[in-house]
């Protein structure tokens, strides 16, 4: 990665960091943006994902500009929302949250939306919205209880981690798999490269 190009990730999510690394992108800095993620009244899940990703990117960008010795950087932010119809599911933090989410998702289709927002060093804002449709099998009570006991769901939108045990719940998936994990790679890489970020430079020195 060129020393002239810095990438700041406005998220502390280990999953997003790992996904970027999977694409050969190593953020120069992790700067989580703490914002109020409460949906607005009657806000559509798509709109929520876009709004929160924008607010995260803008907050991180503004914070960077106040720092002494600020170096112009690309700022990348994302937010993932899971919804059944227009009903937005929470990022599960309690056992009840997780059990309620899984009960609602059991045997049904839902959608996973990710808003991606990129602010260039010059302050230009670019955004993408990615949607994935997912259908879960019918989950018996015992399976829900076992999954909740695993703790894997904690902090996850919709109360599950598709890259873990919950991968066995998926009957059908239409769209980006990495979107469900937390960051749609194809769209993220396209957004960065479209604004001149040298995505492939680090690939040249990557070891097999």
Swiss-Prot record:
User: Which cofactors does this protein require?
Assistant: a divalent metal cation
Establish whether keyword Cytoplasm is in the entry: yes
Principal localization reads: cytoplasm
Q: Name one Pfam family in it.
A: Maf
Where does it live in the cell? Answer: Cytoplasm
Q: Which UniProt keywords apply?
A: Cytoplasm, Hydrolase, Nucleotide metabolism
Q: GO CC annotations?
A: cytoplasm
The record's active-site residues are 79
A Gene Ontology BP annotation from the UniProt entry: nucleotide metabolic process
Q: What EC class does the entry list?
A: hydrolase
**Record GO terms (molecular function):** dTTP diphosphatase activity; UTP diphosphatase activity
Site feature Important for substrate specificity, where:
15, 80, 163
Recorded catalytic activity of this chain's protein: dTTP + H2O = dTMP + diphosphate + H(+); UTP + H2O = UMP + diphosphate + H(+)
Gene3D superfamilies, A to Z: 3.90.950.10
**In the Enzyme Commission scheme, what number(s) does this protein have?**
3.6.1.9
Q: Which domain of life is it from?
A: Bacteria
CDD domains under this entry? Maf (cd00555)
What is stated as this protein's family in its record? Answer: Belongs to the Maf family. YhdE subfamily.
Q: What does this protein do?
A: Nucleoside triphosphate pyrophosphatase that hydrolyzes dTTP and UTP. May have a dual role in cell division arrest and in preventing the incorporation of modified nucleotides into cellular nucleic acids.
Instruction: Provide the protein name.
Output: dTTP/UTP pyrophosphatase
Give the source species.
Mesorhizobium japonicum (strain LMG 29417 / CECT 9101 / MAFF 303099) (Mesorhizobium loti (strain MAFF 303099))
């Amino acid at each position: 990665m060129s020393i002239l190009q810095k990438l700041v990730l406005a998220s502390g999510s280990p999953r997003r960091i790992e996904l970027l690394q999977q694409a050969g992108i190593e953020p120069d800095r992790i700067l989580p943006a703490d914002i109020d993620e409460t949906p607005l009244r009657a806000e559509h899940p798509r709109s929520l994902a876009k709004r929160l990703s924008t607010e995260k990117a803008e907050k991180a960008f503004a914070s960077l500009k106040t720092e002494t010795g600020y170096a112009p950087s690309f700022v990348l932010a994302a937010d993932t929302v899971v919804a059944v119809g227009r009903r937005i599911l929470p990022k599960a933090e309690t056992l009840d949250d997780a059990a309620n989410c899984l009960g609602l998702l059991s045997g049904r289709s839902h959608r996973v939306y990710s808003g991606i927002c990129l602010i260039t060093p010059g302050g230009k804002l670019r955004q993408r919205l990615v949607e994935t449709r997912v259908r879960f099998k019918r989950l018996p009570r015992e399976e829900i209880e076992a999954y909740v006991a695993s703790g894997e769901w904690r902090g996850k939108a919709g109360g599950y981690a598709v890259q873990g045990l919950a991968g066995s719940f998926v009957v059908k998936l239409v769209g980006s798999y990495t979107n469900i994990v937390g960051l749609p790679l194809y769209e993220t890489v396209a957004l960065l490269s479209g604004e001149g970020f040298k995505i492939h430079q680090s690939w040249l020195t990557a070891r097999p």
